[in-house]
Amino acid sequence: MISKRDLTIYSPIIISGILIILFIYYIFSGTVRPSIDDIWVINLERDTDKLQHVIKQQYRFPVKINRWNGTYGKDEDRTTADKDGVHFMLSRSENAEENNRSNKILSKPGEIGCWLSHKRLLRDLYKMNVPPNYGHLILEDDIVVQTDFSEKWNKIRKSIPTDWDIVYLGINKMVGDRLNEHVFRWRNDKSPGNFGTHAYLVRHRSLKHILEKLRFMTAPIDVQFYNMLGDLNIYIIDPPLITVNADLESSIDKQQKRVV
């Protein structure tokens, strides 16, 4: 049985030990190279062909691909979208009669559906009980993955700075500063660029900050990232490891024609 005298002697030592452990964890938890710990592909229920297109590439990845049910903008109620940050002014028609006939999204349903899909997935990932350095790879369903992806990724990840918040494994019209042979530091300036959200890795501990920036929709998801995430440590792999299949029609383009 532990006496009061023992507690008096050893308590400061135990407390000091715990504080040292926490300090070491705090210092070194941020010095971890990016890793792909889970993979999520955003896919609409109706796009079964695109899902099969992604599944056929499963063998190129180190872990299993999970499917996230994407939001089909044309089927989304404006009221529900508003609760998730899409103001009525963005989703309603300029025609009052059309708005009275339908409560569905009537303006740019593809862009809004895409934005909601990414935000809802990120919000769900944020709720997961995983380590802070856990890496979530988010994909869209029109991707093309290099056949030697794992080999290249395992090599390139070692050259990505440990302060990473997001790593783009593919992007369009890159804007960045070269760090080494394969990695660029994302740069925000007046020139448009860094388009596309078809393949990006998110550090779990960064999700809270990202979601704060996505509280309200201000632009298509990739443009909003570019406009609002400049204070994060974002890196781009170039040449890309994952690209977009131009032969597959974009889900955004399919929905963009307004239907009432």
Go through the PLM ranges and name each one.
Residues 1-8:
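Short, low-complexity, Lys/Arg-enriched N-terminal segments of secretory-pathway carbohydrate enzymes
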Residues 10-139, 143-260:
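An acidic/histidine-cluster motif and surrounding catalytic segment
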